[in-house]
Design a protein with these regions (language model features):
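Generic structural signal for small/hydrophobic residues in well-ordered secondary structure
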Residues: 17, 45, 53, 63, ...
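Transmembrane helix-loop junction
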Residues: 47, 164-165, 356, 360, ...
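Peri-transmembrane interface segments
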Residues: 236, 244-252, 258-293
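Mid-to-C-terminal secondary-structure elements
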Residues: 129-144, 154-262
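Residue-level detection of beta-strand-connecting loop/turn positions
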Residues: 114-116, 135, 180-181, 367
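Hydrophobic, regular-secondary-structure patches
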Residues: 43-122, 129-132, 147, 164-165, ...
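Transmembrane alpha-helical interface segments in multi-pass membrane proteins
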Residues: 6-11, 15, 19-30, 38-40, ...
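Short cytosolic juxtamembrane segments of multi-pass membrane proteins
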Residues: 2-5, 14, 396-411
């Protein structure tokens, strides 16, 4: 019996009992849908986590000033000066060669305007090397230079949203922007940065689109701040590739704690650790979802085996007749195995459609990122086919061992 003919007969037999076949496929449909949904959610979450962490910097250690009420700050300032440029200098003396340290300070302002518009942006004072640490891309002009900070130049770089609010479709480079009482000249515009989330593993991540960057030295020299306010809001330590992040994070924490007299007024964030925590959470999620999907596939496999055993019993006369006219045992076994495989693959195809719909719904309504890849589809279909083969072997062997004489006498 040719293989193509066996496939044709298998499909014909299944179509004779449409309802029974459909009910048998349900377990495979839900199992494959669960597997595909799990893989798509896992892939989407992994992609999003990596994207967010890359924006924070995989080789960075972040030192952030903690937020307190003003009265609490007054008490804390009796012992700790908060984050200052002295911390930057102290870290530079103990950290390995090749380490880059960048400081950041936000200026609270309510007056940002150009001749064409207004903006409600954050004003951030940073050094000239900050784009390397924060993965910022300049698409118009350039970032300001180290000399701009040293000479306290009043220059600025705009985020994409800030540029649109202040200048619309008009040119921005070389144009003045008023920040409180001071005028700054625009020297650059940043690329649009899309963030699907503003928080990751409890750590806040800010989009740069509405930010305006000015030299840190200019900000500290020309804008007043409250006596209890931190001189710096954040210090980014960019470590060389050959350094252990956990080990250096401990050194950084110890050094800053000593300059702050062991006052807990700062936090240490290691993006690489956050990525590992996210992956660990995702592994647990995949394990739970995998167990649920396995149960559904197991039920589907048992359903296939039951229906195929019933089919063997129902078609005993047919088996005997085929054996009598020359069909071999392996032809009979292959016939029933193909029917089991056809049920599982049909269920897999419908399961892929259902799983894709579930993934799309999760992305739309729950806001979770999902990614369906060719590998995940092949894996889901492969698992389904394997289940069909495994649970179809016993009925196929039983059918192939039916005695032709007994089969023809069976009623």
């Amino acid at each position: 019996m040719f293989f193509a003919e066996s496939v044709k007969i298998a499909l014909s037999n299944l179509l004779l009992h449409k309802l029974r076949t459909s009910l048998t496929m349900l377990g495979m449909i839900f199992g494959v849908a669960a597997v595909l949904s799990m893989l798509s959610i896992g892939a989407g979450a992994g992609r999003e986590a990596l994207s967010l962490i890359q924006k924070m910097g995989l080789r960075n250690v972040l030192i952030r000033a903690k937020a307190f009420e003003e009265e609490e700050l007054r008490i804390i300032r009796q012992d700790s000066p908060g984050l200052t440029r002295h911390d930057v200098q102290a870290l530079g003396q103990v950290l390995p060669a090749g380490t880059r340290i960048h400081a950041k300070k936000e200026h609270k302002t309510y007056q940002i305007a150009s001749a064409l518009g207004r903006a409600d942006s954050r004003i951030l004072g940073v050094g000239a090397g900050y784009p390397l640490a924060a993965n910022l891309e300049v698409v118009e002009g350039s970032f300001f230079l180290p000399t701009d900070g040293l000479k306290r130049h009043q220059v600025c770089v705009l985020g994409k949203t800030a540029r649109r609010k202040l200048f619309g479709l008009n040119p921005a480079l070389g144009e003045p922007v008023k920040i409180d009482a001071l005028w700054f000249i625009v020297v650059g515009v940043l690329a649009d940065q899309l963030l699907e989330k503003d928080e990751f593993e409890g750590v806040k991540i800010e989009s740069v689109n509405n930010d305006i960057y000015i030299p840190l030295e200019t900000l500290l020299a020309k804008y007043e701040r409250k006596p209890v306010e931190n001189e710096l809001d954040e210090i980014i330590v960019q470590l060389p590739q050959d350094q252990d992040l956990s080990e250096q994070a401990a050194v950084i924490s110890g050094m800053v704690a000593s300059t702050h007299r062991n006052i807990d007024d700062f936090s240490i964030v290691v993006p690489e650790r956050l990525l590992e925590q996210s992956r660990q959470t995702q592994r647990i999620f995949n394990l739970v979802m995998g167990a649920i999907a396995s149960i559904s596939l197991l039920v589907g496999g048992i359903g296939i085996m039951n229906i195929m055993l019933a089919s063997v019993l129902e078609r005993t006369n047919e088996i005997g007749l085929r054996r009598a006219v020359g069909a071999r045992r392996r032809d009979i076994g292959r016939q029933f195995l193909l029917e089991a495989l056809a049920i599982s693959l049909s269920g897999a195809a419908l399961g892929v459609l259902l799983g894709s719909s579930i993934s799309s719904a999760v992305s739309t309504y729950a806001g979770w990122p999902t990614t369906i890849t060719g590998v995940s589809v092949l894996l889901a279909v492969g698992v389904s086919a394997s289940v069909g083969l495994v649970f179809g072997i016993y009925p196929a062997r039983k059918a192939s061992r039916v005695s032709p004489i007994e089969a023809l006498r069976y009623e």
